[in-house]
């Protein structure tokens, strides 16, 4: 109705002779006009512009809020509007699945979805309907594709266009070069050793550097902590450190309390603020600079916004998975550790830094090893204060903030501990050990012994505990395990606090937004890329199942005339990785880890490769070029292309052990906050250890279950070039993504199929209101609508066994307008008027940016 301007084909379903090349050309033609969004029916294609575009903001939110599906050109706000309205109209949960490779712009797309939904939803839960006064979110930032170089600030500030790019190099057990023992650069003066630590509560008596620490005896041994149980609407009681106790490796714990209760007691504006302000906090602890992106997400996040019966956001839940813990101890050249370390060094006051022995990033091995400690145009100190403000918003007290930053400071000192000699290894320089012990509230001798001895429990009935001295390499491995464990517990604590601040226990609908690592392939790929790409295979499987296979299956089940369209089914790749019969790669890996977990890591990796060659070498999507004794990599033919994986440390990383000596040391800390982060008891050689691959299979299945319970909406993000160059469209690079994302197959199904389908009763209950008398059946409605409205043809409708199908979306748009005119004529008139006014404002805003481009809204 209001399609005023046209620039190219805004819906690829309209392409006459679709091919991968033609689709790429159409996307490129729009991109050249700074139109970064294109539709495939209801699937949105989003191309990263790597520059700021004035296509977001309050004017555009109002414009899309008041527009029906026929009113607006492709835009992420249009998709967000559709998801929100469907939740309202159909009373069903929705989800937005954002996919694409690293650097394609998934994270900023997720932010824009959240901004739109919090803006258009009511500000209170006691009254409402749809489209309240907005979320009090201040100014909405412009779409910036080229400068996503710091954690996203709260609303009203600038934002960037991140991707999710990983590192190529990976850590060794000793922490990488310059030696297997790990090794920071020579430290500059830090003003002497740290102050004495507080009186240790119950610490063991001091022993010499070379001796064995006393065994940790704290009662029955509990299984290691997992990353939390699947969420429940009720939130559940608080737990120590906010770590859930269920098996799935997804961090979702709410920590209890918060804003739980009925919707009548919920401060909706506070919930909106938590949802938006948690972004810079989550990015600070979960994002990092990589070689291809200055703000790369190094974890997966699924955020569910919970809505009450009045469609107001009354709660939320963040589920996290696949945190890249190895980044704490190793980054490849020109990458950085997680943002929070640099922010802390840049933002803490000098007194606190002196008390904690903090100087500059180049003095700490965990930050200096990559030769990159700063990012252009990023003020880490300024970002630190924004992060602290976000912590206050989510209910992390100032005392708790101090505890968190003290632990982060301790991690930096832990990284500077180096070892030498024979087993048990001795510490080269006591200063970083003293600082780490002081900040962790541990006896320095006990901490040292926890690193140069590993506690083992015998498999006999007596379960005798004994100490195994560690050489420098092994001690460095324990040192890095300590650092990664501390960081993971802090990460989970913060996630739990964010969830506590959004906790809601009433009945609700949700809109979920998935932001996860993109597909990764580098010169050197290891266990991390293997896991990331497996999850992306699962997400691609969901997309294919719901948009291609599922749609064709539905036509057959409904008795429709349909000729199947061929497509690549990546189930064969998923089964290669996680299959049970025959066993997939993960099952083979777990089996090796169970049988040889006490053996040297390198020997375990060799055994893993031998079993791969023996059991699944013949698989059509697995390539093992070298099958001899020196075989050290395998290649998987993924849906997105071939990736070769180095087997080095596959078994070590898959075991992901939590060592008893380390836990025992931290459980004896004088700081109760640290003790609360480690409530469990642990033994090293559990009979059936929980492996990383097992956790990943569980978390991906959990995620698939959550997504499958919602009506899905898809955003397919595309990276136009590999150098982050603004408005540079490399056709060959884009066409490769168009091909492996299955966009062409999706277009063909949409062109041959139906844009809308609904159960007959629901359809008649809604659109039957257009008639003066409720129709008795679909045929009666079709006869009426085609007789009274000449622009609607009878062949637009097809009746299946249980559902009614409509071929073109324009028909639905017309019927929606007719329905609004019938049930709310005044509101419809006001909506049209508001649309026209907002359209003028949007055109004026964009006109200032470019005289050549008339308007995004057509």
UniProtKB/Swiss-Prot annotation:
GO CC annotation terms, alphabetical: actin cytoskeleton; cell leading edge; cytoplasm; early phagosome; macropinocytic cup; myosin complex; phagocytic cup; phagocytic cup lip
Location of region: Disordered: 121-265
SUPFAM superfamilies referenced in this protein's UniProt entry, alphabetically: P-loop containing nucleoside triphosphate hydrolases
Positions of the Myosin motor domain: 7-820
Major location (coarse): cytoplasm
Record-listed ATP binding positions: 100-107
Keyword Nucleotide-binding: yes
Chain residue ranges for the region called Tail: 821-858
Entries under InterPro entries matching the protein: Kinesin_motor_dom_sf, Myosin_head_motor_dom-like, P-loop_NTPase
Classification via SMART domains: MYSc (SM00242)
Comp. bias (Pro residues): 183-228
Sorted UniProt keywords: Actin-binding, ATP-binding, Cytoplasm, Motor protein, Myosin, Nucleotide-binding
GO biological process: actin filament organization; chemotaxis to cAMP; cortical actin cytoskeleton organization; endocytosis; phagocytosis, engulfment; positive regulation of cell motility; positive regulation of phagocytosis
UniProt-annotated stretches for the region Actin-binding: 712-722
UniProt GO MF annotations: actin filament binding; ATP binding; microfilament motor activity; profilin binding
Superkingdom to which the source organism belongs: Eukaryota
Biased amino acid composition, Gly residues: 126-139, 157-182, 233-245
Entry function: Myosins are actin-based motor molecules with ATPase activity. Involved in phagocytosis and motility, and in the maintenance and dynamics of cell cortex.
Domain notes: The head domain possess two actin-binding sites, a classic ATP-dependent one and a secondary salt-dependent one (located inside the GPR domain).
Similarity section: Belongs to the TRAFAC class myosin-kinesin ATPase superfamily. Myosin family.
Name of the featured protein: Myosin-K heavy chain
Phylogenetic placement of the source organism: Eukaryota, Amoebozoa, Evosea, Eumycetozoa, Dictyostelia
